[in-house]
């Protein structure tokens, strides 16, 4: 079963994969990184004018990384706005995804957090740098293959 956006993308020959619907009936699509920017622009023009959230996760140790976008179609007088979830999978080695900052400004800190925790580079992001960890931090703490450095806690002298 296809949702409205998926049917529209198929009709116009845009490559994607439908991952079905979640428990709330929200359609989930899988998009390749090289197709993400054009599909993001199309989604915005199609009416998905609000980026509700963006997050990222490590699919499996040594496997792919995923950047997840929850888009909402806000319209006047509509109590239940239409939503869609888009997942962009990227290889662990040199993970790169086009930034959607220039489409939805709310992607700014969310993409930076995904970069900081998982190391996904968002191309054309204006300020892509660490947001939670110090700049000197080595590695990506939320990757499943991350090895935590040895820390020695200094006890307070009483």
Swiss-Prot record:
GO BP, one annotated term: photosynthesis, light reaction
One term of GO molecular function: quinone binding
GO cellular component terms given for this protein: chloroplast thylakoid membrane
Record-linked SUPFAM superfamilies: Nqo5-like (SSF143243)
The keyword Cell membrane is assigned to this record: no
Cellular compartments annotated: Plastid, Chloroplast thylakoid membrane
Protein topology in the membrane: Peripheral membrane protein
Enzymatic reactions: a plastoquinone + NADH + (n+1) H(+)(in) = a plastoquinol + NAD(+) + n H(+)(out); a plastoquinone + NADPH + (n+1) H(+)(in) = a plastoquinol + NADP(+) + n H(+)(out)
Keywords: Chloroplast, Membrane, NAD, NADP, Plastid, Plastoquinone, Quinone, Thylakoid, Translocase, Transport
EC number: 7.1.1.-
Presence of the UniProt keyword Methyltransferase in the record: no
Cross-referenced InterPro entries: NADH_DH_suC (IPR010218), NADH_quin_OxRdtase_su_C/D-like (IPR037232), NADH_UbQ_OxRdtase_30kDa_su (IPR001268), NADH_UbQ_OxRdtase_CS (IPR020396)
Role according to the record: NDH shuttles electrons from NAD(P)H:plastoquinone, via FMN and iron-sulfur (Fe-S) centers, to quinones in the photosynthetic chain and possibly in a chloroplast respiratory chain. The immediate electron acceptor for the enzyme in this species is believed to be plastoquinone. Couples the redox reaction to proton translocation, and thus conserves the redox energy in a proton gradient.
Family: Belongs to the complex I 30 kDa subunit family.
Quaternary data: NDH is composed of at least 16 different subunits, 5 of which are encoded in the nucleus.
Protein known as: NAD(P)H-quinone oxidoreductase subunit J, chloroplastic
Gene assigned in the entry: ndhJ
């Amino acid at each position: 079963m296809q949702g409205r956006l998926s049917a529209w993308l198929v009709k116009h020959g845009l490559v994607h994969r439908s991952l079905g619907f979640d428990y709330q009936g929200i359609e989930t699509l899988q998009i390749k990184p090289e197709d993400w920017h054009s599909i993001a622009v199309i989604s915005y023009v199609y009416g998905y004018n609000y980026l509700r959230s963006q997050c990222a996760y490590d699919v499996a140790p040594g496997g792919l990384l995923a950047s997840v976008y929850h888009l909402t179609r806000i319209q006047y007088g509509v109590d239940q706005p239409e939503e869609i979830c888009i997942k962009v999978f990227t290889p662990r080695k040199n993970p790169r995804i086009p930034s959607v900052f220039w489409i939805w400004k709310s992607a700014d800190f969310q993409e930076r957090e995904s970069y900081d925790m998982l190391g996904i580079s968002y191309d054309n992001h204006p300020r892509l740098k660490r947001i939670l960890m110090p700049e000197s931090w080595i590695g990506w703490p939320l990757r499943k293959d991350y090895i935590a450095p040895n820390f020695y806690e200094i006890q307070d002298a009483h």
